[in-house]
């Protein structure tokens, strides 16, 4: 009673196709697919960037501590 049957879904799809047309729906689908692909690519690249940034920060910290020790010894 509370669920949506297959016939109701088919009627909704038919109305959407009549309102927007197949060409507009096709471009909308391809745009959505490209957006998802770009998002996945960005998410895959982000941890690499974060790892490099943390390594650079660690190297800078180590270099700074080394320079401070050299100044204290001099």
Swiss-Prot record:
Region feature (Disordered): 45-74
One GO cellular component term noted in the UniProt record for this chain: TAT protein transport complex
Record flagged with keyword Acyltransferase: no
Pfam families: TatA_B_E
A molecular function (GO) term: protein transmembrane transporter activity
Chief place where the protein resides: membrane
Keyword Electron transport: no
Keywords linked to the UniProt accession: Cell inner membrane, Cell membrane, Membrane, Protein transport, Translocation, Transmembrane, Transmembrane helix, Transport
InterPro entries: TatA/B/E (IPR003369), TatA/E (IPR006312)
Membrane-spanning parts: 1-21
Subcellular localization(s) per the UniProt record: Cell inner membrane
Membrane topology: Single-pass membrane protein
GO BP: any one term: protein transport by the Tat complex
Family of the protein in this entry: Belongs to the TatA/E family.
PANTHER family: SEC-INDEPENDENT PROTEIN TRANSLOCASE PROTEIN TATA (PTHR42982:SF1)
Subunit composition and interactions: The Tat system comprises two distinct complexes: a TatABC complex, containing multiple copies of TatA, TatB and TatC subunits, and a separate TatA complex, containing only TatA subunits. Substrates initially bind to the TatABC complex, which probably triggers association of the separate TatA complex to form the active translocon.
Reported function: Part of the twin-arginine translocation (Tat) system that transports large folded proteins containing a characteristic twin-arginine motif in their signal peptide across membranes. TatA could form the protein-conducting channel of the Tat system.
UniProt-recorded name of the protein: Sec-independent protein translocase protein TatA
Name of the coding gene: tatA
């Amino acid at each position: 009673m509370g669920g949506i049957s297959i016939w109701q879904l088919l009627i909704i799809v038919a109305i959407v196709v009549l309102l927007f047309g197949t060409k507009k729906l096709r471009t909308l689908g391809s745009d959505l697919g490209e957006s998802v692909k770009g998002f996945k690519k960005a998410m895959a690249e982000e941890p690499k960037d974060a790892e490099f940034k943390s390594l650079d920060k660690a190297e800078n910290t180590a270099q700074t501590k080394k320079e401070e020790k050299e100044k204290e010894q001099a």
